């Protein structure tokens, strides 16, 4: 009896110890690198489980092994088969980043799930698990001193942002990279050095994009283009969703609705439009279908745990999915674009690439599916490669498009991505709702994506799901004209959401809003050049004007476009404006102060902002005549930067630009 009591007491102590501690601490190795970057390796780190790094393009240069000299403290542990990394930081630190998420700009107190998912209307997990994964946190402390933390890990993971930053992964032990700088701007630049920056996009992609699920047949596409020009509404791009395909089979064209896609694209080009066409990863499993047959010959498909080909239902029915961990598959996929682009296609839209799979519990393929890999990427299960599936797809697409059109800059838009994927594609924030809530949410969402290294982003203007009201659309297009990526999009079965669909007042608001964007193209293009060279975001939180000012840290309705323009939406309530004489400016003769919809645009004291002449297409873009808006500071001085090149091709890499 005494033995039993002692045993029970011992078990109680053990359970108490497990409850209070819960985690098995592990040792670590710290590598000090240039530029105030430290890399932390847990004792159980297996390089083969994380090589190559999908996030890091340029490995930081080690200086020497040192004791932890960082103001942050990193620790590793194991708990219930999960690998955990925790980062402790000081008081009064505001946290940002974590990629594409719903909620406030400041992420303190939030938990984010990193498992890319098709999240229609952001209904799953309250929008804390969306289409992309960015294992990255930006911290801003007192006096603006800042840090950034990367969990270099693709496996399924959660980020909890409490008194400590906690990364909890279902995969093997992973390394953590910490950046410490004097300002968030310097942290973003260092992130750009590590992950790479965007390539300078074609100028036309900075224009306005009109999309719908779906514009068909081809005569409707032509009519849309004609109406845009007739109504003098600035627009550069018209988009084709899946209904252009033959029975939803990728790289095909419907023989009735789009019998001659080359002629359709030629018509758009003649009227100064570009076209973007959708390509999904799901391939109809059908003998005789050329995409399936050619992939079958090289064993291109993701496999099940039992080594059979995985079949999942998407739009065409039973589909197979390319295994992009194999170099031969990536090359094969890229080669499919040659004939496709030869039909006059200008850009590509990679959708459904989480990958989305219908009629499954989690709307994707099983964790246990197998990726074959090769000498470059190790074979492993889908749990490891799920979050980078879309990233691998868009890299393969981009490479194929470049090979097809070597003299043109590629444009790819993706729904799914991962930290570092900005190198290959722009992104939008997925299937939002036509609601004032989602309009307001679009600002912190786009800002946190921007603060996670993805500068070329924006939501569906007007909202994708549901029906926009005239008032909602007017508010959205008025603000949406200032998103880095400006595209209107709506779902099948919803009302038409073209600028003229809501009556004369909204049509006028839309025209004026887009005229503002197009006159700002010299400034906007310069911001993209800056981002391509430094990693700085195009759309920035207001606190970037003065990171030491605590009162600016929570502002999530107003936002900066670059460093010189502050956008203040009409629905902004008690929005914070930085100190100094920020002046309200007119870009195209509009008077925003008393307007119901147009946001106020304020210029920073000491800034010079260039404008081009009014145009409706970037094909007419010219700097032969420019207008300068000059705002003198208290010292009666001002300065600005203007970058210019041909807007297409790669001559700028050989010095063919003006600065």
Model-assigned labels for residue ranges:
Residues 136, 187, 191, 228, ...:
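A residue-level signal for conserved active-site and pocket-lining positions in enzyme catalytic cores
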Residues 76, 140, 150-153, 161, ...:
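Glycine-rich, histidine-containing beta strand-loop boundary motifs that form or position
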Residues 126-127, 201, 211-259:
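A conserved hydrophobic secondary-structure block that centers on an alpha-helix together
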Residues 234-510, 545-546:
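Aromatic- and carboxylate-enriched substrate-binding clefts and catalytic-loop regions
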Residues 18-20:
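C-terminal motif of bacterial Sec signal peptides marking the signal peptidase cleavage site
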Residues 24-205, 212-213, 218, 225-227, ...:
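Catalytic and substrate-binding clefts that recognize carbohydrates or anionic sugar/phosphate headgroups
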Residues 1-8:
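Bacterial N-terminal signal peptides that target proteins for export
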Residues 124, 398-410, 417-428, 441-445, ...:
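Catalytic core of carbohydrate-active enzymes
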């Amino acid at each position: 009896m005494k033995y039993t009591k002692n045993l029970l007491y011992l078990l109680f102590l053990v359970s108490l110890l497990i409850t209070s501690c819960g985690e098995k601490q592990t040792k670590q190795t710290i590598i000090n690198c240039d530029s105030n970057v430290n890399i932390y390796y847990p004792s159980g780190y297996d390089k083969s489980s994380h090589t190559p790094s999908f996030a890091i393009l340029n490995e930081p240069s080690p200086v020497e092994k040192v004791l932890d000299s960082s103001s942050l403290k990193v620790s590793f542990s194991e708990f219930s088969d999960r690998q955990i990394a925790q980062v402790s930081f000081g008081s009064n630190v505001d946290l940002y980043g974590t990629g594409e998420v719903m909620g406030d700009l400041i992420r303190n107190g939030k938990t984010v799930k990193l498992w890319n998912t098709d999240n229609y209307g952001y209904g799953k997990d309250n929008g804390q698990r969306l289409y992309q994964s960015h294992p990255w946190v930006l911290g801003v402390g007192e006096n603006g001193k800042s840090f950034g933390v990367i969990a270099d890990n693709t496996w399924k993971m959660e980020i909890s942002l409490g008194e400590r930053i906690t990364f909890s992964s279902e995969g093997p032990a992973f390394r953590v990279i910490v950046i410490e700088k004097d300002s968030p701007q310097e942290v973003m630049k260092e992130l750009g050095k590590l992950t790479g920056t965007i390539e300078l996009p074609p100028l036309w992609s900075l224009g306005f994009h009109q999309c719908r699920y779906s514009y068909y047949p081809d005569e409707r596409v032509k009519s849309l283009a004609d109406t845009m020009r007739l109504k003098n509404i600035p627009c550069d791009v018209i988009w084709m969703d899946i209904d252009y395909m033959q029975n939803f089979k990728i790289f095909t064209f419907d023989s009735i609705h789009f019998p001659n896609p080359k002629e359709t694209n030629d018509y758009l080009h003649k009227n100064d439009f570009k076209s973007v066409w959708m390509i999904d990863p799901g391939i109809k499993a059908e003998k005789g279908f050329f995409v399936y047959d050619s992939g079958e010959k090289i064993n291109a498909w993701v496999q099940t745990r039992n080594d059979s080909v995985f079949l999942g239902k998407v739009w065409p029915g039973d589909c197979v999915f390319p295994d992009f961990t194999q170099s031969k598959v990536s090359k094969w996929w890229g080669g499919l674009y040659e004939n496709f682009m030869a039909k006059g296609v200008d850009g590509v839209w990679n959708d459904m690439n989480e990958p989305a799979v219908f009629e499954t519990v989690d709307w994707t393929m099983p964790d246990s599916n197998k990726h074959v890999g090769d000498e470059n990427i190790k074979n492993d299960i889908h749990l490891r490669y799920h979050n980078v599936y879309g990233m691998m797809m868009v890299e393969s697409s981009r490479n194929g498009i470049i090979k097809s059109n070597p003299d043109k800059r590629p444009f790819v838009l993706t729904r799914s991505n991962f930290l570092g994927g900005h190198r290959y594609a722009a992104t939008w924030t997925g299937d939002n709702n036509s609601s004032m809530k989602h309009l307001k949410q679009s600002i912190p969402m786009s800002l946190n994506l921007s603060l996670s290294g993805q500068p070329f982003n924006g939501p569906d203007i007007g909202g994708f799901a549901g029906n926009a009201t005239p008032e909602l659309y007017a508010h959205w297009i008025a603000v949406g004209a200032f998103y880095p990526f400006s595209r209107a999009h709506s779902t099948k079965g919803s009302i038409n959401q073209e600028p003229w669909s809501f009556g004369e007042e909204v049509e006028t608001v839309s025209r004026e809003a887009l005229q503002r964007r197009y006159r700002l193209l010299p400034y906007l293009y310069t911001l993209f050049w800056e981002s391509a060279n430094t990693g700085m975001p195009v759309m920035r939180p207001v606190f970037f004007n003065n990171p030491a000012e605590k009162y600016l840290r929570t502002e999530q309705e107003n936002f900066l476009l670059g460093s010189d323009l502050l956008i203040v939406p009409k629905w902004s309530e008690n929005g914070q404006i930085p100190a100094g004489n920020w002046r309200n400016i007119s870009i195209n003769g509009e008077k925003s102060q008393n307007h119901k919809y147009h946001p106020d645009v304020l210029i920073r004291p000491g800034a010079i902002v260039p404008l081009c002449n009014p145009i409706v297409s970037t094909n007419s873009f010219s700097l032969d005549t420019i207008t300068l808006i000059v705002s003198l500071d208290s010292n009666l001085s001002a300065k600005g930067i203007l970058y210019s090149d041909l807007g297409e091709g790669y001559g700028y890499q050989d010095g063919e630009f003006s600065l």
